[in-house]
Each structure stands twice: as C-alpha cells, then as structure tokens.
Amino acid sequence: MATKKIFISAGETSGDIHGSNLIREIHKKNPSIKIYGLGRNRMVDAGLNCIHDMSSRSVMWMHTLEKIPGLWNVFKDCTRFFDEEKPALVILIDYVGFNLYLAKAAKRRNIPVMYYISPQLWAHGPWRVKKIRKLVDRMVVIYPFEEAFYASEGVSVKYVGHPLFDELNTRNIDEILVKKMRGGEGKTIVSLLPGSRKQEISRLLP
C-alpha cells in the first residue's frame, strides 16, 4: 500500500505554530503519513517535508499572485507537487490570499481541501465565502460563531475549539508573576495580540 501523503500550507508565524501542533497530532494517529508543504521552522521540527520556507513571505494581500515577488514560483512548485505526488488531502491554515489559489489548484485536480483556522471573512472580505463554498470541502473553525456563520452560507463546517488553549496547557504558568501583574486588588489582565505579521504589529500597537 502506498504511503499516504498530506499537503499543508501555512504562510505566517501563527499558522506555523498551529500547523506544527497539527502535524504532531496527525503523527500520533498515524506515524506513517508523510506530510509535505509550506511552513516555517516549527512545522519542520514537527516533521514537515518543507517545499518552501515561508519565513520571509508573510505579506498583506493587495495584489494578484503573479505580482508578488517569489510567491508565483512557490505556487507553481506546489501545483507541480500536486501533479506528481497526488496528496490525499490539502490542509490550508489561514493565509487566505495565497491559500485560496492553492484551494483552486487542488480542486481542479480532485484533491480534497480542508481549511483549518478560518480567515476572518466575517470581519472583512465576506464576498470570499462564495469561493470557500466552491473550493473547500470542509472548514474547521476555532470560534463557535464561525460554525454558525459558515453553516448559514451552505459550507460544510466543524468547530473544534481554539488551539491556543492546547498550547497553554503545555506551558507552566508563573502564578507569582500573574499575581504581581494583577496587583493587590486582583485586577483583570488584558492581553494585546495584534497579529503575527510585522506590518500588523507596527500598525496596530500603540
């Protein structure tokens, strides 16, 4: 029996973190599955056979794929992989501008597409839902309201919870530091999480 291959695409730091955890869980279920795709160091450490390192390719999407330096070649290498290796499944993690191109390429080749961690279409770009419905076989979402949002649009969807909580469960919480930050009155701590792109951090943080 041929070894099953899965292709995963994650273009950003956050996607690399969640993608690495996903790869580990897949290998817990079936260590023989070979995983290829696009990612960064964490996914490689988890077992990704990396076609392209995406460390320097996180961009704000304002152009077509052909006009973004380097990404067109990345896309062509991915489609070549689809043709030659015929993966059993393509898993896309956020990074909507690029990943929808991959979804379309996979769909043309009759390769099932799963989208893990939805792009925030409910906040911006709701017109992309039509593309999702056409190109993606299964949305796997991390917020409860996203499940209702996609279901109302006729998209096959499953809510699985936020992977950040799984990540936190692997960390030791410094209770002394938490108590110090809250102060004597036990104040609530609020975290500012502007995103993983340098552009987002520079634009959104004070």
Q: What are the language-model segments listed below?
A:
Residues K4-R182, V190-I201, L205:
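Active-site and donor-binding regions of nucleotide-sugar-utilizing enzymes
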